[in-house]
Amino acid sequence: MVIEDISSILRQEAEAVLNIPVVAEYNEAVTLIVEYVHNRNGKLITSGMGKAGQIASNLATTFSSTGTPAFFLHPSEAQHGDLGIVRDNDIMLLISNSGKTRELIELTRLTLGLAPDMKF
């Protein structure tokens, strides 16, 4: 791979980010993250399965590296003990292609059992 190829890939990725549609749901998500993480001293918890899980993991890493407390919680691991890290002032960002991912539905149910006011 040469410099021109790398530059082209980076330009394409930057353009993709710039073209993210800013709709009401996006604005609401950003507002919730600011409220819970920065105003309430919570954490941003991301989760997803498969490729969506890789995206969620990358998001958590990016947020963490820019000063926003965040981590990736694998849905299956959450069911076997890792859910104990979740607190009431945290917020979850769940990534799913279909919106019907079985493991994320179960993660939501289990989380609400521990933190009934959790925002997703």
Regions found by a protein language model. Give the residues of each.
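An N-terminal, well-structured beta->alpha segment
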Residues: 1-42
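Glycine-rich phosphate-binding loops that contact phosphosugars or nucleotide phosphates
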Residues: 34-38, 43-120
